[in-house]
């Protein structure tokens, strides 16, 4: 749910900033992929080449503020809970999605009635719960992968004083 607020929804903080406020990208999207013992976090932001450095700095600032200096508030909590609950019926629209939920229950050791409890679990989320989750998403252990015209992008990255490793396309 915290990821939805950061970059998982079209109304997420990152999308509203980079796309709507600044106009540097068609969209920003993030996802936290649940696998056993890990939670890989991916963020995609195809931005204008001339704004690569600015966008990277803005995204890093938004992520640093997420759950800390700009914590998730009750309005955001209500939005993500409502979205989560309303999206539940769509998660079981076909046999494949039902099978996927059964498989995930087995993989993660969940009870067979886990899906029946999801609406209540969403509704029980507090802003404190979401802010704790936000800190896990944005703990700073990030690897940034930037793809673009090196002549145009590298000087922008140099201004950010981030370590850069250049790999050329095969």
Q: Which ranges hold each PLM region?
A:
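His/Glu-based metal-binding/catalytic segments typifying zinc-dependent metallopeptidases
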Residues: 1-11
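Generic marker of residues within folded, mature protein domains
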Residues: 8, 33-35, 134
